[in-house]
């Protein structure tokens, strides 16, 4: 692979939708939260950008052969809307004399759904590695405190770890609908203590 060219794009509208969606589905799966339409709706509605604490800085990565991939990226001025509770980290960092914000976040805003965060044009490990490297380079060049990638798939989480990234371990609870016909039927399956 030749030298990477990383474009930092402040609005997803400046990235061709077909290009973005090709990368977002290169693993053969459609994730609505990674679609160009969804991410653009967050921007045009004002849910991200401005004073929300989510400033878009999406990555478009190319080499001499063409497109390598894209990354949904945001400069974060706070920890709101991440569903990762790092306020304690921020407080400790600042008490120690550091500056926790701004930080760089590869994520889907307000969406604690597991999914890929580095999106290569083809589902190939070398391209994914190049995208992880591009993210690290952007973090260094922009002078943010740190780079965070939240709700990665297990495969991408392991890949990031193999590249030397620190791996956060957390716990999520998932609800599965067992074909309940109504909310009342669900409540009927719970003990009185759990029905609060």
Language-model-derived ranges and their functions:
Residues 1-196:
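N-acyltransferase acceptor-side catalytic subdomain
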């Amino acid at each position: 692979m030749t030298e990477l060219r990383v474009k930092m794009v402040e609005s997803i509208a400046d990235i061709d939708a077909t290009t973005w969606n090709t990368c977002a589905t290169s693993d053969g799966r459609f994730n609505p939260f990674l679609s160009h339409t969804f991410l653009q709706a967050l921007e045009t509605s004002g849910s991200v950008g401005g004073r929300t604490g989510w400033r878009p800085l999406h990555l478009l990565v190319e080499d001499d052969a063409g497109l390598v991939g894209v990354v949904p990226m945001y400069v974060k001025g706070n920890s709101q809307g991440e569903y990762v509770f790092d306020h304690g980290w921020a407080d400790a960092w600042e008490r120690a004399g550091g500056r926790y914000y701004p930080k760089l976040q590869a994520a889907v805003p307000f969406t604690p759904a597991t999914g890929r965060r580095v999106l290569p044009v083809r589902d190939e490990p070398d391209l994914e590695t190049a995208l992880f490297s591009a993210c690290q380079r952007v973090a260094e060049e922009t002078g943010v405190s740190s780079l965070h990638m939240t709700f990665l798939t297990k495969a991408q989480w392991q890949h990031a770890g193999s590249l030397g990234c620190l791996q956060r371990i957390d716990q999520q609870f998932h609800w599965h609908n067992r074909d309940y016909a109504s909310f009342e039927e669900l409540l009927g399956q719970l003990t009185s203590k759990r029905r609060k």
